[in-house]
Amino acid sequence: MITWSFIDLWRTSHSTLFQMTLATVLMAPVLGDCGPPPLLPFASPTNQLYESTTFPSGTVLKYTCHHGFKRVNSSHLSCDENGSWVYSTFCARKRCKNPGELVNGKVEIPSDLLVGSIIEFSCSKGYLLIGSATSRCEVQGKGVDWSDSLPECVIATCEPPPPISNGKHSGRDDDLYTFGSVVIYNCDPTFTLLGNASIVCTVVNRTVGVWRPHPPACQKIVCHRPQIPKGYLAPGFRQFYAYRDALEIRCKKGFILRGSSVIHCEANGEWFPSIPTCEPNGCTNIPDISYASWEGYKFPLRNFEVFEIGAKLKYQCKPGYRASLNDPQTVTCQENLTWSSTNGCERICCPTPDMEKIKIVSERRDFTGTCIYAYGDYVFYICNEGSYPMSTDGRSSCQADGKWDPAIPSCQADSGLQNRLALFTFPNISETNVTNKTYLFGHEENSTEHAMKGVCLKPMVINGNLSVERVIYAELENITIQCDPGYTIVGSPNIICSNRTWYPEVPSCQMEVLEDCRIVSRGAQLLHCLSSPEDVHRALKVYKLFLEIERLEHQKEKWIQLHRKPQSMKINRSFRLCN
């Protein structure tokens, strides 16, 4: 619309002013008219307007509500003096009826039930929707109604569960598998189930029933018993293990576990996590202490044993040895897994006798050690004229405490001893050589008588041999006895002449009888002629006694032969097995 101000009109030319005045006069009759009425979405004019384009002020038009709408106010439009159509909303949307309840489902109404509204349908879990999932409130004839009727919710069903190799499920072919149905799979013997043993009928995308999860598989799975040096299996062990079997692993004392203490047999036949190891957490390689033994251990300690940190081992020196000065005689396992140091054991020496006052007849000495005389060494000695040995037999031994027993080889004066001269030859016996020494005792008319008081007669050992064959043996002379083949020595093989007596006593040689072999041989023959095992047992006892008598008789005959006496008549004790 073009507007002009009053001042502008007076500034225009006379011709323009005339034209505007004329237009004002001509337009005066239509200043209050209205144009065509508005197009309403809910109503239309009742009467046809015949393409009228202008309506005078005060014109009233009647409207009719569209289908799906109903009148709620005056349905008139008025043209006011300003040339505008005046009206209020007089038609409202009609309402569809309530759709009702959906069995095993629900109806969702987003806003309202008025015409044009859309409602949605959904089924409960495990049910499938049969029908339309939505419905629209629309005009139908002169009224309104829903475009789609209520759908139906039916329970979902699944196909029969699939079979598996080397196994079966709990269902039957004629079963109806609905939502929530469960079947359980089992494997044949010696097969292991991989996966979930049970599957469930469920719904996917609200449209189809399927089994979830996927059926399991049956396979042969074997895990071998793990080898864990210095470790062991806590609950015991088997040679083979099946899928998902668990093992608890522990380490022996002195070792620490590196890795997981619990492992499981996996589907690939391997253990998971990986098999752990047992590593030393203590000291090994026990110190080798010469001339010592470990206290509290009956058998020698083994180097593969492991001792915990802080463990202490106490050792004892062997007889003839003692701990070094200020040594605690213990070793300790330290944090660096090594043993503390020790000085060990040192040899105990016996004092050396005064060689100017004694004469050694025989001795045993260890020439490889640091001592002249050490534990186990001994000497046989005589004294110079006018004295006699401190020990009764002229023998003294070096003891473990470093002292001589009975006393250090020495001599003491004999005021009643007369001069005697006797000449004897004694063996000087050592570990490496044997020589003869001559000693002067004195002389007298009866020197031979006195000398014979110190000799020994030849020992009689039946079925045995002497290392030195003589008729008589000198005082302090020692010999060795060895038995003939088939005989065993009973007693000490080494004896020494002391005060006209052999010390220790002369041993004997006893025959080695293989009684078991002879008894078994006889028993095999007895079984052929005796009726019962009890008779055989008694017969074997009698035969064993017969063998003992026969052995004693044999020894008696040999002794008689050696002493050149008339031989005894041998008794015939033949043992008849069967008549």
From Swiss-Prot:
Cysteine pairings via disulfide bonds: 34-79, 65-91, 96-137, 123-153, 158-201, 187-218, 223-265, 251-278, 283-333, 317-345, 350-398, 383-411, 456-497, 483-509
UniProt keyword annotations, A-Z: Cytoplasmic vesicle, Disulfide bond, Fertilization, Glycoprotein, Repeat, Signal, Sushi
Post-translational modification: Glycosylated.
GO cellular component: acrosomal lumen; acrosomal matrix; acrosomal vesicle; cell body; cytoplasmic vesicle; outer acrosomal membrane; plasma membrane; zona pellucida receptor complex
Positions glycosylated per UniProt: 73, 82, 196, 205, 336, 428, 433, 436, 446, 465, 478, 499, 572
Keyword NADP in annotation: no
Cellular compartments annotated: Cytoplasmic vesicle, Secretory vesicle, Acrosome lumen
Gene3D superfamilies per the UniProt record, alphabetical: 1.20.5.3730, 2.20.28.230, Complement Module, domain 1 (2.10.70.10)
Pfam families, per the entry: C4bp_oligo (PF18453), Sushi (PF00084)
UniProt tissue specificity: Testis-specific. Not expressed in heart, liver, abdominal muscle, lung, brain or kidney.
SUBUNIT field: Homomultimer; disulfide-linked.
Domain Sushi: 33-93, 94-155, 156-220, 221-280, 281-347, 348-413, 454-511
Function: Binds to ZP3 glycoprotein in egg zona pellucida. Probably involved in interactions between sperm acrosome and egg zona pellucida during and immediately following the acrosome reaction.
Originating organism: Mus musculus
Keyword check for Disulfide bond: yes
Protein name: Zona pellucida sperm-binding protein 3 receptor
InterPro entries to which the protein is assigned, alphabetical: C4bp_oligo (IPR040514), Compl-Cell_Adhes-Reg (IPR050350), Sushi/SCR/CCP_sf (IPR035976), Sushi_SCR_CCP_dom (IPR000436)
Signal peptide positions on this chain: 1-32
GO biological process: binding of sperm to zona pellucida; single fertilization
